[in-house]
């Protein structure tokens, strides 16, 4: 949840519009959590804590772009792992999968995710993630999140849903 500010009583955190924070000497920040806003700042920390609370998680992560978040997820996998993805994805995501991660040893398989029979036939012991975008950009295809979640849960596979276009 959201905690109030003890010094002001404010129930909403302020937006910190600073890039740097006080240092007692070079490389020695006054508060070890905050040295430079690109790494961390109190506003982003408040957002991440709120997201974790809403999702009943232990930690939330906020990124400056969807592709940065996608890259973070993909770095959880190793050579030999397989990822099943929708056949219609945002171009940047598709290029990340097929070009940037081309030499990673991670195998990407693209499928009409609403053809559940074909989708299930691609699942094997190396399948670690199913990646869905719904609605898709630009074709506005929709995916049956509930049905896919049931399949991934039954197979102990992670399931990621990018709903950027909906938001």
PLM features: what roles do these ranges have?
Residues 20-71, 76, 92-101:
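Conserved N-terminal alpha-helix of the aminotransferase class I/II PLP-enzyme fold
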Residues 1, 19, 113:
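Active-site donor-binding loop signature of nucleotide-sugar glycosyltransferases
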Residues 61-167:
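Conserved PLP-enzyme active-site core in the AAT-like
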Residues 14, 44-48, 145:
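A general structural signal for well-ordered alpha-helical segments in protein cores
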């Amino acid at each position: 949840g959201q905690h109030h500010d003890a010094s002001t009583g404010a129930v909403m955190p302020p937006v910190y519009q600073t890039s740097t924070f006080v240092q007692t000497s070079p490389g020695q920040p006054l508060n070890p959590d905050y040295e430079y806003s690109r790494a961390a700042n109190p506003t982003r920390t408040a957002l991440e804590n709120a997201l974790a609370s809403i999702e009943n998680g232990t930690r939330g992560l906020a990124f400056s772009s969807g592709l940065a978040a996608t890259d973070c997820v993909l770095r959880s996998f190793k050579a030999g792992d397989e990822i099943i993805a929708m056949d219609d994805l945002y171009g940047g995501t598709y290029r990340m999968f097929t070009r940037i991660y081309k030499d990673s040893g991670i195998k990407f398989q693209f499928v009409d995710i609403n053809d559940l029979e074909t989708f299930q036939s691609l699942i094997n012991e190396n399948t670690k993630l199913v990646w869905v975008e719904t609605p898709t950009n630009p074709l506005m295809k929709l995916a049956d999140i509930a049905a896919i979640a049931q399949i991934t849960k039954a197979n102990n596979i992670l399931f990621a849903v990018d709903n950027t276009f909906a938001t």
